[in-house]
Amino acid sequence: CYLSEDHMLGARENLRLLARMNRLSPHPCLQDRKDFGLPQEMVEGNQLQKDQAISVLHEMLQQCFNLFYTEHSSAAWNTTLLEQLCTGLQQQLEDLDACLGQVMEEKDSDMGRMGPILTVKKYFQGIHVYLKEKEYSDCAWEIIRMEMMRALSSSTTLQKRLRKMGGDLNSL
């Protein structure tokens, strides 16, 4: 399983698209900021094993895609940029699907992956609750856009770490 340079370029392009989606000055929205508990240490640190790292990366990208591929999201953002972001996230997910399939075949049990995956799901659940509580306001979406930039930046760090291991996820 190999993460190509195109995969890494796609990750950087997704971050650029999120930056371009900025519609508001963040200053009026600062009172709406919240700590969503990004599992940054888990994602950026060295504590994940190969199967966990691939699973966490896939889950983060899937949850980010799910967040932006909604009716509420399409009402909040420039449609062209949003479609490009969703397409980019989908491409990254497809790249990872083969890796995830290999990992799942190699392991009889997915119990080792469940803890980190549940942490990621809990993080995104908090984001969905926040958006609903804030009634999907423009400020709430701006806070989430900035948060997703942090999350995708962290996931890019994990992807770089996976590639540094010779580009071969099996060498982790």
UniProtKB/Swiss-Prot annotation:
Changing D6N: In IFN-tau2B and IFN-tau2C. GO terms for biological process: adaptive immune response; B cell activation involved in immune response; defense response to virus; female pregnancy; humoral immune response; natural killer cell activation involved in immune response; positive regulation of biosynthetic process; response to exogenous dsRNA. GO terms for cellular component: extracellular space. It comes from the Eukaryota. SUPFAM superfamilies: 4-helical cytokines. It is found in: Secreted. Disulfide bonds join C1-C99, C29-C139. Keywords: Antiviral defense, Cytokine, Disulfide bond, Glycoprotein, Hormone, Pregnancy, Secreted. It holds the Pfam family Interferon. Its main location: secreted. Constitutively and exclusively expressed in the mononuclear cells of the extraembryonic trophectoderm. Glycans are attached at N78. One of its GO terms (molecular function) is cytokine activity. IFN-tau genes are intronless. They evolved from IFN-omega genes in the ruminantia suborder and have continued to duplicate independently in different lineages of the ruminantia. They code for proteins very similar in sequence but with different biological potency and pattern of expression. PANTHER family: INTERFERON OMEGA-1 (PTHR11691:SF37), TYPE I INTERFERON (PTHR11691). Paracrine hormone primarily responsible for maternal recognition of pregnancy. Interacts with endometrial receptors, probably type I interferon receptors, and blocks estrogen receptor expression, preventing the estrogen-induced increase in oxytocin receptor expression in the endometrium. This results in the suppression of the pulsatile endometrial release of the luteolytic hormone prostaglandin F2-alpha, hindering the regression of the corpus luteum (luteolysis) and therefore a return to ovarian cyclicity. Belongs to the alpha/beta interferon family. IFN-alphaII subfamily. This is Interferon tau-2.
